[in-house]
């Protein structure tokens, strides 16, 4: 028998949580952080606002949990047998995510609150760690095949692969084209092959 208040997989509590978190992402996408409120989320989710407040004390913690839940969605990482193709495909995947309405909205929210002491401010490191864990095999396989130097840091390589794309979205507002994604992948690969991402002492 379930304890009182326990969240049962597939139960009403779990369904309510899923509906509320989905409503948060939809509100962020449609209206942005400034116009999002517990009340608008509750209305979209079809629940009373007191239901939301019982679980999440404020807007910040509510949005943080929704973003964490969204980050749990795994990306299908490329595994073509060639590091150049893998990195190019990965950059294109990131581009597609960032140019979607939902991806652009959530990324801007994360960036805008990255220095918050709690709530949303704690999500970005968690999201990056999750995505890095997924992408790391691309680098380890490439090292094993002799395509990249031993000791190549997956973290550094992925930062340099994605940074130009985030820069276009968040700083310059330049179009995020497939060509720009391919260029980012090529630049990161060239640096990796040159040993730029091998920490001192590991080479």
Question: Where does each model-flagged region fall?
Answer:
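C-terminal peripheral helix-coil segments that are non-catalytic and often amphipathic
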Residues: 1-7, 89, 133, 137-144, ...
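Basic, helix-initiating cap at the start of DNA-binding domains
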Residues: 1-44, 50, 61
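Short amphipathic alpha-helical segment with a characteristic S/N-K-E followed by hydrophobic residues
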Residues: 20, 35, 58-63, 73-74, ...
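Amphipathic alpha-helical segments used for helix-helix packing
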Residues: 61, 66-67, 98-125, 136
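Hydrophobic alpha-helical connector segments
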Residues: 75-104
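Amphipathic alpha-helical packing segments from all-alpha helical-bundle domains
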Residues: 118-144, 155
């Amino acid at each position: 028998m379930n304890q009182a208040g326990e969240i049962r997989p597939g139960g009403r509590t779990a369904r309510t949580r899923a509906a509320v978190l989905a409503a948060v992402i939809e509100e962020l996408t449609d209206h942005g952080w400034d116009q999002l409120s517990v009340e608008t989320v509750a209305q979209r989710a079809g629940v009373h606002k007191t239901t939301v407040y019982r679980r999440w004390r404020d807007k910040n913690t509510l949005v943080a949990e929704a973003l964490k839940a969204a980050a749990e969605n795994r990306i299908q990482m490329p595994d073509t047998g060639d590091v150049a193709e893998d990195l190019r495909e990965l950059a294109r995947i990131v581009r597609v995510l960032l140019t979607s309405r939902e991806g652009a909205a959530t990324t801007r929210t994360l960036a805008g609150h990255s220095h918050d002491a709690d709530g949303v401010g704690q999500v970005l490191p968690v999201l990056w760690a999750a995505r890095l864990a997924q992408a790391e095999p691309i680098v380890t396989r490439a090292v094993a095949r002799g395509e990249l130097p031993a000791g190549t840091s997956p973290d550094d390589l992925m930062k340099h692969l994605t940074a130009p794309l985030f820069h276009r979205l968040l700083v310059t507002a330049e179009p995020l084209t497939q060509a720009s994604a391919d260029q980012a992948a090529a630049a990161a690969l060239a640096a990796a092959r040159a040993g730029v991402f091998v920490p001192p002492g590991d080479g």
